[in-house]
Each structure stands twice: as C-alpha cells, then as structure tokens.
C-alpha cells in the first residue's frame, strides 16, 4: 500500500485521468473529491461490497 501525506487543497493523480483532492479535514473525517472519466466507477468501499454481493452469479452486466 502506498501511503501519502496531503494537505487540504492538495491533489494526487492516479494514472493520467483520475485526480483525488483533499477538500477538508474535521476531526477524524476527511472529505475528498474524485475526478474521473464516466467509464471509471467510483464507490465507497461499503457500497462497492453491496453491489458485488447483489450481483447474480453468471450475470455479466452487459
């Protein structure tokens, strides 16, 4: 796992098209903004896990 330190307003790049910006920090919560192309899915981990659990086995999604 890569661990980075960023301050509010600073951005990191993932590949050429995805940016993650620290928008704010309040207590133990960090607000981040993600800018990615429409074809790149971005979910919180708990939402992604729910989506995966709801997929029907053998369903391709196409």
From Swiss-Prot:
Subunit structure as annotated in this protein's UniProt entry: Homodimer; the beta-strands of each monomer intercalate to form a hydrophobic core, while the alpha-helices form wings that extend away from the core.
Q: Which family does it belong to?
A: Belongs to the CsrA/RsmA family.
Designated gene of the protein: csrA
Identify the domain of life: Bacteria
Q: What Gene Ontology terms describe what this protein does at the molecular function level?
A: mRNA 5'-UTR binding
Gene Ontology terms, cellular component aspect?
cytosol
Localization per Swiss-Prot or TrEMBL: Cytoplasm
What task does this protein carry out?
A key translational regulator that binds mRNA to regulate translation initiation and/or mRNA stability. Mediates global changes in gene expression, shifting from rapid growth to stress survival by linking envelope stress, the stringent response and the catabolite repression systems. Usually binds in the 5'-UTR; binding at or near the Shine-Dalgarno sequence prevents ribosome-binding, repressing translation, binding elsewhere in the 5'-UTR can activate translation and/or stabilize the mRNA. Its function is antagonized by small RNA(s).
Q: Where is it predominantly found?
A: cytoplasm
What organism is listed for this UniProt entry?
Aeromonas hydrophila subsp. hydrophila (strain ATCC 7966 / DSM 30187 / BCRC 13018 / CCUG 14551 / JCM 1027 / KCTC 2358 / NCIMB 9240 / NCTC 8049)
**Per the record, a Pfam family?**
CsrA
Q: Quick one: a GO biological-process term for this protein?
A: negative regulation of translational initiation
The record's InterPro entries line, in alphabetical order, gives: CsrA, CsrA_sf
Q: What is this protein called?
A: Translational regulator CsrA
Question: Using the chain's own numbering, where are the disulfide bonds?
Answer: none
Keyword line = Activator, Cytoplasm, Repressor, RNA-binding, Translation regulation
């Amino acid at each position: 796992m890569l661990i980075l330190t960023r301050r509010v307003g600073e951005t990191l790049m993932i590949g050429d098209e995805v940016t993650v910006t620290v928008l704010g920090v309040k207590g133990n919560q960090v607000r981040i903004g993600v800018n990615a192309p429409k074809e790149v899915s971005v979910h919180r981990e708990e939402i992604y896990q729910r989506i995966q659990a709801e997929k029907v086995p053998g369903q391709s999604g196409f």
